[in-house]
């Protein structure tokens, strides 16, 4: 039994090392690739200082942090709701952030600065999170809380549809681009949003023990002495914060929170001591590679990154499911 545990631990370490190398390679490629290829030797030239340090680096850091946040949020929600299909958009938090952002765009007539839009998106996500916590205080079961989140998401989606229907053509273009996701407008002015993600990411990665208990189910977690009500509230709030900040940075991006944790579990990373940091590394790498494709696929335009993640990731996910079922 001890030998089996050691083998699993070594396998987890190997996976984390491989994912770390993949993330570093994706980071290097993201800084080099673009309309102009800039090799590392030219990064400190005048051209490199402009393109790499002022344009590509802040965008790359934002992609890394958002990818990690979405993947970890998916892992937390899948353990919390005992549902492999749970992901950040399922509880309505992503749509809540969207309602906040759309309200800011429409009421501000497209004139509000980016920091104000970011604050409105975070506020929308936190409002939905507070509503969910209100439900949680009534000691609803996990399945009922999940259904409440789905209902809130549907309501927020309807509100966004109504807002887009009555918006002007200029606002409509901005809103539609946001709904498809993208990092085109990210620069160092959004560094405060990036910094807002880091403490929460680090804190959740350290919560492997309660996460492992939650993954066993509500009854087992209570028998092991876990204060289920407390941890459910804390994790829902943490997820709401990370999703709200991510939406403020990049808009609505699906697939990452759903598939990355599931793929890592299929690969053998079931212990949250390895799964949580693995999700951060894999989510960051996957979203960064998708962002590179979005930038380079068309010569004169940029693809929405949400479309790229769904197009590239869904076939891989289906292949892994078929492989695991054999």
UniProtKB/Swiss-Prot annotation:
Cytoplasmic topological domain: 1-10, 82-92, 139-141, 207-228, 268-274, 325-326
Transmembrane segments: 11-35, 57-81, 93-107, 114-138, 142-166, 191-206, 229-249, 258-267, 275-296, 305-324
Any one Gene Ontology BP term: cobalamin transport
Entry GO MF terms: vitamin transmembrane transporter activity
Function text: Part of the ABC transporter complex BtuCDF involved in vitamin B12 import. Involved in the translocation of the substrate across the membrane.
Subunit and partners: The complex is composed of two ATP-binding proteins (BtuD), two transmembrane proteins (BtuC) and a solute-binding protein (BtuF).
Family stated for the protein in its record: Belongs to the binding-protein-dependent transport system permease family. FecCD subfamily.
Protein name as catalogued: Vitamin B12 import system permease protein BtuC
Organism: Escherichia coli O157:H7
Lineage, top ranks: Bacteria, Pseudomonadati, Pseudomonadota, Gammaproteobacteria, Enterobacterales
Gene name linked to the record: btuC
């Amino acid at each position: 039994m001890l030998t089996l545990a050691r083998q699993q631990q070594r396998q987890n370490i190997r996976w984390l090392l491989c994912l770390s190398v993949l993330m570093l390679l994706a980071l290097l490629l993201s800084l080099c690739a673009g309309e102009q290829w800039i090799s590392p030797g030219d990064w400190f030239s005048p051209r490199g200082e402009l393109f790499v340090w002022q344009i590509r680096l802040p965008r790359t850091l934002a992609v890394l942090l958002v990818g990690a946040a979405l993947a970890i949020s998916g892992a937390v929600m899948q353990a919390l709701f005992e549902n492999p299909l749970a992901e950040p958009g399922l509880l309505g938090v992503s749509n809540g952030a969207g309602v906040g952002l759309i309200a800011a765009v429409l009421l501000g007539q497209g004139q509000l600065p980016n920091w104000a839009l970011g604050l409105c998106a975070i506020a929308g996500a936190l409002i939905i999170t507070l509503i969910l916590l209100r439900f949680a205080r009534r000691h609803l079961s996990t399945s009922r809380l999940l259904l409440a989140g789905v209902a809130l998401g549907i309501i927020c989606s309807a509100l966004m549809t109504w807002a887009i229907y009555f918006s002007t053509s200029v606002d409509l273009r901005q809103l539609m681009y946001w709904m498809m996701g993208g990092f085109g407008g990210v620069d160092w002015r959004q560094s405060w949003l990036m910094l807002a993600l880091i403490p929460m990411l680090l804190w959740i990665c350290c919560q492997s023990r309660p996460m492992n208990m939650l993954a066993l189910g509500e009854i087992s977690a209570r028998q092991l002495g876990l204060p289920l009500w407390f941890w459910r509230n804390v994790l829902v709030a943490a997820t709401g914060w990370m999703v709200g900040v991510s939406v403020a940075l990049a808009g609505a991006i699906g697939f990452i929170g759903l598939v990355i944790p599931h793929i890592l579990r299929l690969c053998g990373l079931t212990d949250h001591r390895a799964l949580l940091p693995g999700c951060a590394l894999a989510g960051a790498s996957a979203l960064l590679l998708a962002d590179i494709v979005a930038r380079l696929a068309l010569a004169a335009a940029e693809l929405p990154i949400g479309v790229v993640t769904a197009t590239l990731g869904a076939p891989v996910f289906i292949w892994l499911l078929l492989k695991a079922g054999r």
